[in-house]
């Protein structure tokens, strides 16, 4: 409680001191104004007296000081306003320069697009002109066609093997293929003398025979193999 009371007293003292200082300031201002008025009146009387020299009063000096302060404040405010105006002008100039760059970029893009369109149109025109020239060229006459047909007819006659190859190159139906593969034929090897059963294009089949027939086939095959080897080696006269 004692601490609280001391705090309240200190606060009240500080408040009373502040009020006293404010009152003193007001009194000093009033005194200065009175002194200034008295000095001005005395200066006027002295100026009216002959041979008196005019001395500057303290009020005049204070007023001149106040005027100088006001001038400095006005000059500082004018300088701040000029700086703000210069910054605004610089920002406006930068914005105008950026707008000018954007406009130039757009103009350049438009020019490029126009050039591309012109090139495409030129290419299309050239292609059309070339196609028309090709169509306008005269084709082969009837005489030339007859001559070429006669030359083809006068060529060599195709053999059976060539015809069979040409037929083999043609596409076959499933029925034709099945019929061709179902054919079984005996083929004799001229060098060895062996006979084989071949189905279709080249499938080799095994023939079921008796033992005696198998022996005869082996004898013929060995004889044929020997003769073929001797012919290749040049042993036969």
Swiss-Prot record:
<dbReference type="GO" id="GO:0003723">
    <property type="term" value="F:RNA binding"/>
</dbReference>
<feature type="compositionally biased region" description="Basic residues">
    <location>
        <begin position="1"/>
        <end position="29"/>
    </location>
</feature>
<dbReference type="GO" id="GO:0008380">
    <property type="term" value="P:RNA splicing"/>
</dbReference>
<dbReference type="GO" id="GO:0005730">
    <property type="term" value="C:nucleolus"/>
</dbReference>
<dbReference type="GO" id="GO:0016607">
    <property type="term" value="C:nuclear speck"/>
</dbReference>
<keyword id="KW-0507">mRNA processing</keyword>
<feature type="compositionally biased region" description="Low complexity">
    <location>
        <begin position="74"/>
        <end position="98"/>
    </location>
</feature>
<feature type="cross-link" description="Glycyl lysine isopeptide (Lys-Gly) (interchain with G-Cter in SUMO2)">
    <location>
        <position position="199"/>
    </location>
</feature>
<keyword id="KW-0832">Ubl conjugation</keyword>
<protein>
    <recommendedName>
        <fullName>ADP-ribosylation factor-like protein 6-interacting protein 4</fullName>
    </recommendedName>
</protein>
<keyword id="KW-0539">Nucleus</keyword>
<comment type="similarity">
    <text>Belongs to the ARL6IP4 family.</text>
</comment>
<keyword id="KW-0597">Phosphoprotein</keyword>
<dbReference type="InterPro" id="IPR019532">
    <property type="entry name" value="Nucl_RNA-splicing_assoc_SR-25"/>
</dbReference>
<comment type="function">
    <text>Involved in modulating alternative pre-mRNA splicing with either 5' distal site activation or preferential use of 3' proximal site. In case of infection by Herpes simplex virus (HSVI), may act as a splicing inhibitor of HSVI pre-mRNA.</text>
</comment>
<dbReference type="Pfam" id="PF10500">
    <property type="entry name" value="SR-25"/>
</dbReference>
<feature type="modified residue" description="Phosphoserine">
    <location>
        <position position="55"/>
    </location>
</feature>
<keyword id="KW-0508">mRNA splicing</keyword>
<comment type="subunit">
    <text>Interacts with ARL6. Interacts with ZCCHC17. Interacts with SRSF2.</text>
</comment>
<dbReference type="GO" id="GO:0006397">
    <property type="term" value="P:mRNA processing"/>
</dbReference>
<feature type="compositionally biased region" description="Basic residues">
    <location>
        <begin position="101"/>
        <end position="126"/>
    </location>
</feature>
<feature type="modified residue" description="Phosphoserine">
    <location>
        <position position="148"/>
    </location>
</feature>
<feature type="region of interest" description="Disordered">
    <location>
        <begin position="1"/>
        <end position="161"/>
    </location>
</feature>
<keyword id="KW-1017">Isopeptide bond</keyword>
<feature type="modified residue" description="Phosphoserine">
    <location>
        <position position="182"/>
    </location>
</feature>
<feature type="compositionally biased region" description="Polar residues">
    <location>
        <begin position="34"/>
        <end position="45"/>
    </location>
</feature>
<dbReference type="GO" id="GO:0005634">
    <property type="term" value="C:nucleus"/>
</dbReference>
């Amino acid at each position: 409680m004692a601490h609280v009371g001391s705090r309240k007293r200190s606060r009240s003292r500080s408040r009373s001191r502040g009020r006293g200082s404010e009152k003193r300031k007001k009194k000093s201002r009033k005194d200065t104004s009175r002194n200034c008025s008295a000095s001005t009146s005395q200066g006027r009387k002295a100026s009216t007296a002959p041979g008196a020299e005019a001395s500057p009063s303290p009020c005049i000096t204070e007023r001149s000081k106040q005027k100088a302060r006001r001038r400095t404040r006005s000059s500082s405010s004018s300088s701040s306003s000029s700086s703000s105006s210069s910054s605004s002008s610089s920002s406006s100039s930068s914005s105008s320069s950026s707008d000018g760059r954007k406009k130039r970029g757009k103009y350049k893009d438009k020019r490029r697009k126009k050039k591309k369109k012109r090139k495409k149109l030129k290419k299309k025109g050239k292609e059309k002109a070339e196609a028309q020239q090709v169509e306008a060229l005269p084709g082969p006459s009837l005489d030339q066609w007859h001559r070429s047909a006669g030359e083809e007819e006068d060529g060599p006659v195709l053999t059976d093997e060539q015809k069979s190859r040409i037929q083999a190159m043609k596409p076959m139906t499933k029925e034709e293929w099945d019929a061709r593969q179902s054919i079984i034929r005996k083929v004799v090897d001229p060098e060895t003398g062996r006979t084989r059963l071949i189905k279709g294009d080249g499938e080799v089949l095994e023939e079921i025979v008796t033992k005696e027939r198998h022996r005869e086939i082996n004898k013929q095959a060995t004889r044929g193999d020997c003769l073929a080897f001797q012919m290749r080696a040049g042993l036969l006269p």
